[in-house]
Amino acid sequence: MPTPSSALGVRAVRAFTDNYIWLIEAPENRLIAVDPGEAAPVRAELERSGASLAAILLTHHHPDHIGGVAELLAAGPVRVVGPADSRIPMAIETVGEGDRCEFPDLGLGFDILHVPGHTLSHIAFFGHGALFCGDTLFSAGCGRMFEGTPKQMWTSLSRLRDLPPETLMYCGHEYTAANLRFALTAEPANTATSEYRDRVARLRAADQPSLPSPLSLERRVNPFLRCEVPGVRQAAAAHAGRPLQGDDEVFGTLRAWKDQFR
């Protein structure tokens, strides 16, 4: 059964081994699916709750985020909104930086942020106190840079970090526990991070999601949002074995370090 979460009315539906498909609740028992990589979990929740699918939001083109769209559309046409990217094989309504995605009949609307780095066309949806950011920002971590540069990714993460602190962040994967192991390696004296690690361990032991996470917490525990903090800069420079200059270079060093971290 999906796990309900607060703010906006959002349900977490699990997919594959660690993906989350977020279902945004709308009036008249309608749901908006965010990044449905699989159709079956969404269909199961629609059947369980008697809800109907009102729309689909896509953050990027990776198969584990769009793989269920065609099957869901086979049950009936719904509005699909996502980035302009030829690797998304179905016809969708494309949006980009500065656009606003409105659902007047649902009383919902989201601002579109272009956040390149994980992929070049990656977008995020921000509205109603919630941020749906796909694989750009994770709790205590961030996505790998499959296409973008460290400067692009750092700029994207900085934009998300600077959204209102009470914003709840809904990302695409349950990576929090593993991310916290790295965060405490990069910043071992951060008591907020160690406290969060213990809380996440309890949640996961109870088979509960660690998400959503407020940006106010991410600013305190996520090393990839803290590249200007002296302790994080020093740890990155020590790992690189040389002085580092700008925050984007600190970020790039941290990301490369995390890529090899076990």
PLM regions and their residue ranges:
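Active-site HxH/HxHxD metal-binding segment of metal-dependent hydrolases
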Residues: 16, 30-31, 38-113, 195, ...
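Conserved beta-strand hairpin/beta-sheet module of binuclear metal-dependent hydrolase folds
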Residues: 2-52, 123-137
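Active-site metal-binding loops of divalent metal-dependent hydrolases
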Residues: 36-38, 61, 85-86, 118-119, ...
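Accessory terminal helices/loops
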Residues: 158-168, 177-262
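Divalent metal-coordination and catalytic microenvironments
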Residues: 24, 35, 60, 72, ...
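Active-site-adjacent loop/tail segments of enzyme domains
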Residues: 141-167
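Core dinuclear metal-dependent hydrolase active-site scaffold
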Residues: 3, 23-25, 100-126, 131, ...
